Amino acid sequence: MRRLVNDGYEAVEEMLAGYVAAQGKYVDFAENDKRVIVSKQMSEEPRVRIIVGGGSGHEPLFLGYVGKDFADAAVVGNINTSPSPEPCYNAVKAVDSGKGCLYMYGNYAGDVMNFDMGAEMAADDGIRVETVLVTDDIYSAENVEDRRGVAGDLIVFKAAASAAAKGLDLDAVKQAAEKANANTFSMGVALSSSTLPVTGKAIFEMKEGEMEVGMGIHGEPGIKRTSIEPADKVVDQIMGYLIEEMKLTAGEEVHVLINGLGGLPVMDQYICYRRVDEILKEKGVHIHSPLVGNYATSMDMIGMSITLVRLDDELKDLLDTPCDTPYFKVD
């Protein structure tokens, strides 16, 4: 195992302790729960609070986006495991200001069950909690409502957080998140598994020199395994699926996110972006504020995903609204 951990069973707690110590300008633990990270820069004015969360191992996803005018709290589960209902509830209690809270997370069964239980507990206290599930992974299911959430989490979280920062009510904030989700499309490729710190073993088997297009961030099966191909061929394949799914046409405008899965060098990520840029320009599609980097990872997995967001003036404004967190800033 090529990981720098101590006791694998303590990896999440030690990571959280280090994160809060390093990012104390932005975050702290909730008073009664060290699986809840809360913003130290929440608006003093009552407004809708944004709560995100899910399993560990995808950092900076979730906890890295808690800060000013973005997420107000993140609920942290064990590696690739949903947080339990209690911290989901505790996050609401920690940040609610009387305007209600919006839960947002990727569409995975364990997360849905436990966050729903947290929302029910909050409702018993008279606190309204709504939920938006992120479903951007186009290969994971034919029906959109059954799809998984991957790197598109970042886009949906940002849209909702911007709406909340503008002072919109809970229904309008939820609507902004749903609109962003409906216009966000992702697909990835894996060239290796990730490694569990508890066992030191890969979460799935992949031979050296293989790749799998469409694989999920937890190792969910993709389209097929083949020998690793040149970057342009891989990008062409993924972009073909995305463009077909979106029915993308000349004159449209999109936001592009090239997301590293943890082990892919930055050099490779920009090589992939270069090809995406070429494809979209050849098609007459305009690109707005592209992002390249590690935003939603799978520990040390070698791979990347491409996310395209169909834009209109409203979504552009929401994505361009200023925010400040340890791992995402808009000036």
UniProtKB/Swiss-Prot annotation:
Record has Transit peptide as a keyword: no
Compartments reported by the entry: Cytoplasm
Signal peptide per UniProt: none
GO cellular component terms, semicolon-separated: cytosol
UniProt domain DhaK: residue ranges: 7-328
Active site: 58 (proton acceptor), 218 (tele-hemiaminal-histidine intermediate)
A GO BP entry: glycerol catabolic process
Name of one Pfam family that matches: Dak1
InterPro entries from the UniProt entry: DhaK_dom, Dihydroxyacetone_Kinase
Enzyme Commission number, as recorded: 2.7.1.121
Keywords tagged on the record: Cytoplasm, Glycerol metabolism, Kinase, Transferase
Superkingdom classification of source: Bacteria
Induction, per UniProt: Repressed by GolR.
Gene Ontology molecular function: glycerone kinase activity; phosphoenolpyruvate-glycerone phosphotransferase activity
Reactions catalysed, as given in the entry: dihydroxyacetone + phosphoenolpyruvate = dihydroxyacetone phosphate + pyruvate
Primary enzyme class: transferase
Pathway in which the depicted protein is active: Polyol metabolism; glycerol degradation
Binding site for dihydroxyacetone: 55-58, 111
Location, primary (coarse class): cytoplasm
General remark: Unlike the carbohydrate-specific transporters of the PTS, the complex DhaKML has no transport activity.
Role, per record: Dihydroxyacetone binding subunit of the dihydroxyacetone kinase, which is responsible for the phosphoenolpyruvate (PEP)-dependent phosphorylation of dihydroxyacetone via a phosphoryl group transfer from DhaL-ATP.
Subunit annotation: Homodimer. The dihydroxyacetone kinase complex is composed of a homodimer of DhaM, a homodimer of DhaK and the subunit DhaL.
Protein name (record): PTS-dependent dihydroxyacetone kinase 2, dihydroxyacetone-binding subunit DhaK
Gene: dhaK-2
